[in-house]
């Protein structure tokens, strides 16, 4: 079945992509967001959800999660004209009659214009690399934590030895029934003070061990099998939830297949954020131009220009004068 034709497809559901989608809704066009991860929000939501951000206009400070929640709430005003596709990675797109055919790892989409807001490329969590892992993912196996309360009264196992793993273990100590940290080395990579707190806590530390297998029923993991490094000792850990904190990897390999002009790992754009292909625009960290400052605030400023230019491209005969939001929303 041929996909519905959208006015603008935004590649990337991070802060810049979300704001671009909102502004496109404000301008009355239909929008599709294609995001490679299983949730919206990009790096602030995934990599530093609880850390404070201080350079967002009108907010003295807010966390990555709060920023994401606000952007999603803002976009919800136009949910009737916005479609969101998660866990889809754009492989290629080609010019066709009336717009572009966009091929992802799951489907083919059609759009009249494209705005690329994928940051430094698609990024994905580093996994355990175990059979059946994907089956448990997003059920009771997590690569990121947003709501600590969801683990209340549970037996939680955390794999990893960096700052996030240690911070989550400490935060869950008084919430979960038990917390166990599994790390492949005796030494942790986290901040020294945090490691000292961890060692003085009630968190159970198992080092040096590596995950070997997952056991469960249906979509729920029940046991993690671990083996001591360079030894035959094997343990089975009962669990209610498993948190894998191995970090995230980024990749822009597909970006290089999009037949655009590039500057290092970013896309070269004009002052109006037009790429080397007519009808395709790029904003945020994905865009490269002289004097570029890689800040979220910068991307927010780029988004309206790119959206307006995309609308001018799609509807050249329409009266495309920009109107302030105070005149558009009661």
Curated annotation (Swiss-Prot):
Cofactor(s) in the UniProt record: FAD
Enzyme Commission identifier(s): 1.18.1.2
Binding site for FAD: 35, 43, 48, 90, 123, 285, 326
Xref: InterPro entries: FAD/NAD-bd_sf, FAD/NAD-binding_dom, Fd--NADP_Rdtase_type_2, Ferredoxin-NADP_redctase_2
Keyword Flavoprotein in annotation: yes
Enzyme class: oxidoreductase
Cofactor: how and how many bound: Binds 1 FAD per subunit.
GO molecular function, one term: ferredoxin-NADP+ reductase activity
UniProt keyword Membrane present: no
Alphabetical UniProt keywords: FAD, Flavoprotein, NADP, Oxidoreductase
Record's catalysed reaction(s): 2 reduced [2Fe-2S]-[ferredoxin] + NADP(+) + H(+) = 2 oxidized [2Fe-2S]-[ferredoxin] + NADPH
Disulfide feature: none
Subunit structure: Homodimer.
Family statement: Belongs to the ferredoxin--NADP reductase type 2 family.
PANTHER family, per database record: THIOREDOXIN REDUCTASE 1-RELATED-RELATED
Protein name: Ferredoxin--NADP reductase
Source species: Streptococcus pyogenes serotype M4 (strain MGAS10750)
Lineage: Bacteria, Bacillati, Bacillota, Bacilli, Lactobacillales
């Amino acid at each position: 079945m041929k996909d519905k034709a959208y006015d603008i497809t935004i590649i990337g559901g991070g802060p810049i992509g979300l704001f671009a989608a909102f502004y496109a809704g404000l301008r009355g066009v239909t929008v599709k967001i294609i995001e490679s991860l299983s949730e919206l929000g990009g790096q602030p939501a995934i990599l530093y959800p609880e850390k404070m951000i201080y350079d967002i206009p009108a907010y003295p400070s807010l966390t990555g999660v709060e920023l994401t929640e606000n952007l999603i709430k803002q976009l919800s005003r136009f949910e009737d004209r916005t479609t969101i596709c998660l866990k889809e990675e754009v492989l290629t797109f080609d010019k066709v009659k009336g717009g572009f055919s966009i091929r992802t790892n799951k489907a083919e989409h059609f759009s009249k214009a494209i705005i690329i807001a994928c940051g430094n490329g698609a990024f994905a969590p580093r996994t355990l690399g175990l059979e059946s892992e994907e089956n448990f993912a997003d059920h009771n196996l997590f690569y990121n934590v947003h709501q600590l309360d969801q683990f209340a009264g549970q037996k939680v196992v955390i794999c990893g030895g960096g700052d996030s793993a240690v911070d989550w273990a400490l935060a869950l100590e008084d919430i979960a029934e038990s917390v166990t940290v599994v790390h492949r080395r005796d030494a942790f990579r986290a901040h020294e003070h945090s490691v000292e707190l961890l060692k003085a806590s009630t968190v159970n530390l198992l080092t040096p061990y590596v995950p070997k297998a997952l056991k469960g029923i249906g979509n729920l993991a029940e046991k993690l099998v671990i083996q001591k490094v360079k030894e035959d000792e094997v343990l089975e850990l009962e669990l209610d939830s498993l948190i894998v904190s191995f970090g995230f990897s980024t990749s822009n390999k597909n970006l290089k297949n999009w037949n655009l002009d590039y500057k290092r790992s970013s896309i070269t754009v004009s002052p109006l954020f037009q790429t080397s292909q007519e009808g395709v625009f790029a904003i945020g960290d994905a865009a490269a131009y002289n004097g570029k400052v890689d800040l979220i605030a910068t991307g927010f400023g780029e988004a309206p220009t790119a959206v307006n230019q995309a609308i001018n491209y799609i509807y050249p005969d329409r009266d495309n004068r920009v109107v302030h939001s105070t005149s558009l929303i009661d």
